[in-house]
Amino acid sequence: MSSNHLGISGRIAALFQQAQITPLLALVALLLGLFAVGVTPREEEPQINVTMANVLVPFPGASVRDVEQMVAIPAEQVLSKIAGIEHVYSVSRPGLAIMTVQFKVGVPRIDALVRLHDTIRENTDWLPAGLGTLEPLIKPKGIDDVPILALTLHSKGADHTAYDLERVAVSMESDLKRVNGTRDVVTLGGPRRSVRVELDPARMNANGVTVADLRRALQSANMGMPVGEAISANRAVWVEAGPFLESAQDVADLVVQVSNGKPVFMRDVARVQLGPLPATRYVWHGTAHSEGGQEHDAVTISVTKKAGENAIDVARSVLQRVDELKGSVIPDDVEVVVTRNYGETANDKAKKLIQKLLFATASVVALVFFTLGRREAAIVGSAVILTLTVTLFASWAWGFTLNRVSLFALIFSIGILVDDAIVVVENIHRHQQLHPGLPLFQIIPGAVDEVGGPTILATLTVIAALLPMAFVSGLMGPYMSPIPINASMGMVLSLAIAFVVTPWLSRLWMKPHDATHAEPSNAPAASTGLSDRLRPWFEKVFAPLLSERDGPRNRRYMGLGIAGLIGLSVLLPATGLVLLKMLPFDNKSEFQVVVDMPVGTPLEETAATLHDLGAYLATVPEVSHYQAYAGTAAPINFNGLVRQYYLRSASEMGDIQVNLQDKAHRKAQSHAIATRLRPALQEIGQRHNANVKVVEVPPGPPVMAPIVAEIYGPDVETRNQITQAVREVFERTPGVVDIDDTRIASAPRKVYRVDRHKASLLGVSQADIVATLHAALSGESASFLHDASKYPTPTQLQLPAALHGNEDALLQLSARSTTGKLVPIREVVQVQNVLREQPVFRKDLLPMDMVMADMAGAIDSPLYGMFSMRAEIQKIRTPDGLPVQEYFIRPPGDAWKQVALKWDGEWQITYETFRDMGAAYAVGLVLIYLLVVAQFGSYVTPLIIMAPIPLTLIGVMPGHALLSAPFTATSMIGMIALAGIICLLYTSDAADDTPCVDL
């Protein structure tokens, strides 16, 4: 064929089939791919730019109502005007307001935080001076705050306490921070080092000393600064005054008062010692019975990485540095256990997916080998390898990391990527059969041109089907965006390689045929034999449909039958034979046991509950080891980031990080293990009056809880009543587990009410009384040692731990009057015993409560649990006798006039994802239709070509049912891709020039 009659594809093939630059381009593509594999950061999860921040406003002494009305509500109104805000949450507790600002997915972190800081600084008048609030504290959080590595230090014997281990961990922090790519290195656990000044009320009164005197002595004595220069002997001498307090002995030797002409030292009225603070948290490491079954005091070092860094490299470098520190910074009898290594799990996941990618490629090459021959298979295999490598480079250039989603995109599209090369090679092979006497360089341009137009159209149709998915909103959007983007880029690059490199390889590797010694090809014979065997079956099936007499009736019956099958397929999810859920569970190596004791539970009782839970976990064969955290939170994962587990620091809170054996050493999946252990763990929790929840790492974007019911109402009493009724429905519903709500259990509260009139008559200020009581019970860091510690060592004024429950000792403390006399606090306060106030939760400027739960059992999709409760919830009546209004998509417009329930959790993200993917599906179908119309010049023919698309339901839904697989977002992606796999092949024939459409 003359080059003047060739289309764009034929001309490209003619240009590059003998060009010397073609092998260079192929080599560059290969090297770019190898470069991308080496430099692309490897992570287990894709990077999601989701920014949230906590704004904490302390309001000491304020009631919940004051905190809500005077701080939280004005703050919400200020924060909600920031551009890019998704939600504003707040919780008002006694003395503290916590506002959580959640930005929309995709808003750049720096931009979001700059807007937040600017807005707060520009609106400081919402916290007027003198109100009593402290400076707002902004704590931003994002995906990079999730530690990739956790190192737990424990003693091999019983020689080291948590205090000793904390000192070792703090010494390690600076060395680990020197590793390139690390972001934060933080020690969790340990009591912290301090100079404890334990007050002795009797000796203080005997010596005429108050807490204010001790505070003043510490602060005034710990003062030093440069005071200037002095000229002496014709030289300038730098002059300083001081010195600072440098040791516990310096503190003990301070003179705090002069009594009867004699100095009163700090050691005379308090016990001064350097050591750990009173325990406010416990951390310990436990091993399974198979590994000894022991528990040891521990601390954990968590390491986060900078954005864009390779998790594998950072984790490997940190562990190498730890090995270097052993024997020097780390004592020989201290063991370091790697309790989290997301670098290793990311590497394992990447290796596994790359193996699957290679297997898929080998399968395609093997298929071509058996149908076309070994030379053709080698050409297709080379084209596929080049396509994959250059696609990896394009993915890196786009900004994607190498994670399970981006690699899944390549595996998912491997069958599509090979189509272009196979079509070109097969048509060149066919033209060799038709023109055995012509040299390959003359055959190739025409053969490529013949299928070039349909191949371009086929590529565009697949891109049209997939690319709209890149615009899915919410958390799932950036989570799944590598799939449509990588697959679309791969399709374009596959087309370029098919037109540029494949003709060049075909000219070199395919054996030329001549007219007299042409080797017969096995493929046509096999194809002909297969056609001969299938022809009677096709005639038997399709003849009744094409019959002139009975054909119309049979076609109507067939249409009704197909419609019925489609209808039955659609009904499968409704009947529960095919479960609908966001994503299938992954086989993880960890899960958490989250424990909530009744509010007011002492730390020691929480620890006792965790010990009992740990003793049971040690007997589980699949458990390798665990770490228990009482009064503090374990290193968070992405799930904990969204659920704000990092704020769990009360004495009644705890959790256990459970680490399972490697997947290769256990048969059960992590989800099955967690489901199996939940009943026993919750039974142990019930014995301790604890709410125990088993929290798994979600396979996709996390939510506050899988099932969330948000309760809106006009007043607190109504919301509490409806919340309790909804919780009871949750508890009665089979399969609904891990039930909790935002209310707290009734707990005692003691109020020391100052008699202002009497205090004024005695010359004592209320501020002195409150400050004295606060220092005695909570402790007060009156000053700090200057001892070159990384973390400043506070001098902590406080009653001894043994006297914390002794009200007489507390009220024995005195305050100094304006006349200098000591006034015992018991003379100016009245003790009231009341209950703790309930916190108030708000979302997007509306007060609300939440009931949260998970779903477990045979039907573990939260959607089915949610819908199964609707009938019972509709029976609930408000105090006015009205039903509770249900909302599924948006919150109620006016929560002050009605009681409403808004379903959230996994339902919300599932709805948004499938809504957007359904819209993407529709847009893809429209684009495919327009492309095919442009190709055929007909508005009817494309409808005939696209008619089989709905038939995919007949295969997809029953297939999921047969395999007991849930229909997930990835299933939806597969359905969308099926709509785009329309390969248009033009086959030139002497008698017929009609296009052949292969669906």
Question: What are the roles of these predicted feature ranges?
Answer:
Residues T339, A346, A350, V425, ...:
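Helix-loop junctions and hydrophobic alpha-helical segments within the transmembrane domains
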Residues H5, A14, E68-P140, A202-M223, ...:
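Solvent-exposed, membrane-proximal periplasmic/extracellular interface segments of envelope transport
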Residues M653, Y986-D993:
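Conserved small/polar residues in nucleotide/adenosyl-binding loops
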Residues L134, S413-I428, G452-F471, P478-A525, ...:
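Transmembrane alpha-helices and their membrane-interface boundaries in multi-pass membrane transporters
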Residues Y342, A378, A680-S988:
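C-terminal transmembrane helical bundles of large multi-pass transporters
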Residues S2-T361, L402, P478, P698, ...:
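Membrane-proximal extracytoplasmic
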Residues S3-R42, V451, S521-K581:
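Signature of alpha-helical transmembrane segments and their immediate interfacial
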Residues F35-V39, A362-H429, F471, M489, ...:
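Hydrophobic transmembrane alpha-helices and their membrane-interface caps
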